[in-house]
Amino acid sequence: MGDLENLLLEAAGRTNSAGRSRHPPSSRRREGSYSDGSSDSRDDSDEDRGYASRKPSGSQVPLKKRLEAEREDRAARVEGGYGDGPSDREGDSSEESDFGDDLYKNEEDRQKLAGMTEFQREMILSERADKKGDKNFTEKLRSKRESEKTPVSKKETQPLPASRGVRSSARSADRAAAKDDALNELRAKRMKQQDPAALRKLRDASKGGSGSRDFSSTKRKPLASSNLSSSSQSDSDSRSQSDDEGSNGGMLDSDDDRSDVPTFEDVKEVTIRRSKLAKWLMEPFFEELIVGCFVRVGIGRSKSGPIYRLCWVKNVDATDPDKTYKLENKTTHKYLNVVWGNETSAARWQMAMISDGHPLEEEYRQWIREVERTNGRMPTKQDISEKKEAIQRTNSFVYSAETVKQMLQEKKSASVRPMNVAAEKDRLRKELEIAQSKNDEAGVERIKSKIKQLDASRNKKGVDKKALKLAEMNKKNRAENFKNASEVKSITASLKAGEAGYDPFSRRWTRSSNYYNGKNKGKDGEENEAAVAAAVETNGADAGAGVEATEAALEAAAEAGKLIDTRAPIGQGAEHNQLHNFELSLSLTALQKYGGPQGVQKAFMARKQLTEATVGCRVAENDGKRHGLTLTVSDYKRRRGLL
C-alpha cells in the first residue's frame, strides 16, 4: 500500500485515474501528450513564457498581469493534457451538481427512477455514486496540491538566460515523463489486479505510443546535451536515459508477451495421452497434476479421418459417482473439464475420448488462433516449465501411509467385484467392539448403520433369488425354442412315458371335449348310443373310423367308471384330410416350350419392350421376382466398406 500511495501522490500534480476512466476523449488527449509533438510544444511554451510557470506571489504582481498569467497557465495545462483546469470539470459539474447526497436530482427524477426496473435504477444510482466519489477524490487531490505550493520570490521573476530556459524546459519535460511513467505503472497495477487479460490487450495496443515516446525522449536528449553545461549535461543525460528506459518498458513488455507464447515443442511435452491418464487415474497427485496440461480430444470424424482438438485442462470433475464409464481396463467416474480458446467454452469430456497419440502442429496452430480470436488465457513458458517439472517429479513421488490408505479406499469403491458380505460383517463387528471399548458413540452408531445396510442387501438378494431362477429358466427355454425352430427334425408325439425320446414338457395338440355320464353302472345300449351321438354332435364329427374309435373309448370308459380320453379326438376336418391323402402325378414338360422356369421373366421383358416400342412410355422395372429385404452381417460390412 505504501508504493500505491506514493504513486498516487506523485500523480497528484497531473490528474487522477477516475477522471481518466470517466472521460475517454480527455484520456486520449492525455495519451497524445506522450508523443514528441506535445512535448515539443510544451517545451516551446516554457521558453516563450520565460519560465513563467513559477508565478510570483499575488501581493507583488499587479492584478491584470496576475490574471493574464493565470489564463496562460491554464491554457498551457490544457494543451499539455493536465486536465486539472476548469475545462475538464465542466462536464462533471453540469451533471454532478444536479443531484444531492441521496443521489436524486429532484422529486421528478425520483419518480422517473421509481418507474424503471430495479436493475436499471440500481445501475444509474451506482454510476452517480461513482461520479460523486470521483469528484470528492479530485477535490481532495487538488486541495493537497495547492497546499503544497510555496510562494516564489521576486528574484525568480527576472528574465532568465537562454541556457537556463532550455534547462528548465528539459527538466519540466523529464518531470512530465516521470509522471507519465508513474501513472502508467499505477494503471498497470490496477488492471493486473482486476483483469489480467485487459492488461495484455493494453500492452499490445500501446506499442505505437511507446515508440513515439521513445522518439521524443531521444529528441530531447541531444537538445539538452547541446545547450547545457557539463554538470547539467550529465544530469540531463541520466534523466533522459531513465526516460528512455521507462518509455521502452511498454514495448519490451509487449515483446515479452509475444516471446512468452509457448512453442509447439513446449505444448507437446505437457500433452497427456490416454494411456498415461489411465495409469495416473488412481494416483493421489492426478487431480492436481492434470490441471494446466494439454490433451487431444476427439470431437468427431471426417472423410479424411478423426478430428481432434488440442485443449487445455481446467479441472477434474468427480462429483457424480453414479455416472461411470470404462477407461482402458478400469472403471471411473472422473471427467475432465477442458478449454479450447476462451474459458467460456469449457466442456466436460470422458477420458476415454482422449487420443493416445501425439499432437500435430496444425492442431497447435488452430489452438493459438482460437485463443487469440476469443481473447482467452494463454499459458506462459513459465507455466509450461513448471508443469514439466511437476511431471518429472511424479517419477520420484513418495507415498505416505495416509496416501496409500486413500488409494486403497478409492480402488475398493471403484472395484466391480462382488463384496463378501460375511467377511465385511465380521470386520464391522470387530470395529464395533473396539468402538464400544473406547466409548465412541458416534462410531458405534455409524458401524451399526453399516451392518443394517449389509443385512438389508442380503435380504434383498434372498427375495430376488426366485426371480433370478425363473429368469434363468426362461432364458434357457428361449434358447431351446430357438434351437428347435432353427433345426428341422420330426417330433414324435405318440411316445409314451418311459420310452426313449419322450419329453413330458413338450407341447401336444389337444382339443377340448365335454363328457357326462348320467348312470354310473348303466349298460343299456340305447343310452350309450345317445351319449355317443351327443359327443359326435359336440365335436362336429361324422361317422367313420375316428368316430368308431371314439365310441369304443367312451364305452370302455363308461364300463370302468372313468372319464378318460385315451385318444385324441378327431373332427370333421381331420377326416376330410384323410380322404384326400392320395398321390397325384403332374407333368411340367408342357411348360418347356414357354421357356421353363425362366419363362415368366422372359415374357415380362418381351411385353415390356413391346409396350415401350409401341406406346413410347417407359415401363417400371419390375421383373416379378421377390428380392430379399434383409442383409447378412457380411453383406452389410461389405457395402459399408468395412471389409
UniProtKB/Swiss-Prot annotation:
InterPro entries: Plus-3_dom, Plus3-like_sf. Keywords: Acetylation, Flowering, Nucleus, Phosphoprotein, Transcription, Transcription regulation. Disruption phenotype: Early flowering, reduced plant size and defects in floral morphology in whorls 1-3, but fully fertile flowers. Reduced seed dormancy and increased germination rate of freshly harvested seeds. Its main location: nucleus. GO terms for molecular function: DNA binding. It is found in: Nucleus. Component of the nuclear PAF1 complex (PAF1C), which consists of VIP2/ELF7/PAF1, VIP3/SKI8/WDR61, VIP4/LEO1, VIP5/RTF1, VIP6/ELF8/CTR9 and CDC73. It comes from the Eukaryota. This is Protein RTF1 homolog. It comes from Arabidopsis thaliana. Residues 65-77, 124-157, 172-188 have a biased composition (Basic and acidic residues). Residues 1-107, 124-262 are annotated as: Disordered. Component of the PAF1 complex (PAF1C) which is involved in histone modifications such as methylation on histone H3 'Lys-4' (H3K4me3). Involved in regulation of flowering time. Required for the expression of the flowering repressors and FLC and MADS-box genes of the MAF family. Involved in the control of seed dormancy and germination. SUPFAM superfamilies: Plus3-like.
